[in-house]
Structure formats: C-alpha cells, structure tokens
Amino acid sequence: MPYLRHALAGAPFRRSDGQVVVLMSVFMTVLLGACGLVLDVGSWYRADRATQATADAAALAGAQSLIDGTAPAEALAGEYADKNGGGDLTVSFGQRVLENDLITVTVARTEPAFFTKLFGIETVQVNSRATARAGVPSRARYVAPITVNEQHPMLQCECFNDPTQVALINLHNPGGGDAAGAFGLLNLQSLSNPSGNIGADLLGQWIRDGYQDALPLGLYDSAPSANFNSDYIRNALRDRIGEELLFPVYRTITGSGSGAEYDIIGWVGFVPTSFTTGSSTGTIRGYFTKVVWQGLADETGTVPDFGVRVITLVE
C-alpha cells in the first residue's frame, strides 16, 4: 500500500510535466511565427521605402521633360525608374495650372515572403506613387541682372536654340523721356534693399553667380551707373559662356536714369556664346533655351510662359 500511495501521489506531477511541454511547444511556435512576421514586415517596409524612392525619382525626372511633351516625360520617368530598381511602372498626366503640368508615377513590385510562408503567404505586392509638377516660376533664384523685352522676336515665336542676340543699349527714346541712361541692367536688390546706384563689381557677381534669393515679379530699379566694358562685367560674361543664365523679361519701363523701373513679368533661359561691350552699349550673342530652374511655381496661371520650369514633388 505505501508503494501504491507513492505511485498515485506522483501521477499528477507527471501529467503536469506533459502539459508544460505542450504549452512550451505551442508558445515557441507562436513566438517563432511572430518573430518571422516581424522580420518579413520589416523587409516589406524597407521594400516599400525603396519603391517610394523609385517613384519619387521617376516622377521628378519625368517632370523635367514635361515642357517637351508627355512622351519624353514618360520615357525619362521609365529610364529613371529602371536605374533605381525598376518595377511595373504606370505613368499618367494631369493639370494643376498648365495643361499636363503634372506627372504621376506608380511603381509596383512583388516582394517574397520568408518566414510567413509557414502561414501560406508566398509574396506581397508593394505599391508606391509619386506626383511631380512642372510649373512656371513666379519667383526665381540665381537670376542674372540682364533684361530682355517681351517683344524680342525670338520670344514671339518661341524659337528656342536659334542664334540671336540681346542688345544692351541706352533705352532712351529721344523726346520721350523713356528711361534715359537705362542700359538694360537691373538692380536686383532694389525690392528688398533700395540703395540707389550699384557698381559693376556687384553686377558682375550677379552675372557670374546669380542673385541668391528668390526674386518675385514686379518693378525693379535700373542700374545705369556701371559701364559694360568694366572688367567685372566682361570677366563675368566670359566665365558664363556656354552656360545657362536666367534673364528677367520686362514689359514696360517708366522713369529715367537711376529712377527708371522695369516691370518684370517673367523669366527666360539664355545661353551666351560670345559678347561685345562698350562704355554705353553691348551685345550678348547666344540663344534662348528651355530650362529647369530653382524657384517657386505660379499658382494663378497669370505668369507668362517663356520656357522656364520649376520642378516640385507635390504628392
């Protein structure tokens, strides 16, 4: 009987040990599954971020070609998508201000599952979308202080890349009192910091480097005190031969001399190829060009379009 009592007394503990083993097995299975899910979800999250980066790059690249049409924009978007990991690409176009000024790129990739295959999940579809806009700038950075009249023949026909010239001349009309002493150069800081006449050294710096702040459209003072044959201006122009510059486009001039004001209505890209300068005249030869520039895009649809675009990611 003592032996029987000892045997009966030990039986519950043997059953408890078995339950613990079963519970531990279930717990370990759940734990491994949870760890596997965490690892797979982390992998899918990284894939989603990579896919979003691809969509962003493709949309921004495509937007740079929107000014040339939707076909070049779609082709460039596809090219950049392939360079950044590829995927199934869908491209569409829309309008915010100008026709087809928006490009939307959707990138889809199939990502494999690893641990979650135990639960029947073989693959996961990762989709990312980005929209970029190519807008006409209402504000522009890195502007050069050389003006172009909106009636320039090459701006009337949008003859980009055709040889032409910008004349830097005394814009005074005899008997008209129209900006006597104004030679087509602007005091770009006159809106924020009026300071009267400025020197050729500062004008040369703006030609070489562009004005650093984002300039709005509006009335700008003339800069009549600098000679075109100054070494500052000549050296700056020489440094920019063959490079894109951004010129302000004006509609009207009022006043005279240092009091003359140019009504700046837009911006245009120009590539100088050569120049001549004198004390009171000058000519910059080159061609107008479509450019992508830094600035803020117009939201009103009222800024004239001279072939300059500001690219922004809007979604």
Language-model regions, residue ranges each:
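N-terminal leader/signal peptides at the extreme start of proteins
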Residues: 1-17, 22
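Alpha-helical hydrophobic helix detector
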Residues: 22-39, 53
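N-linked glycosylation sequons
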Residues: 71-74, 94-102, 122-315
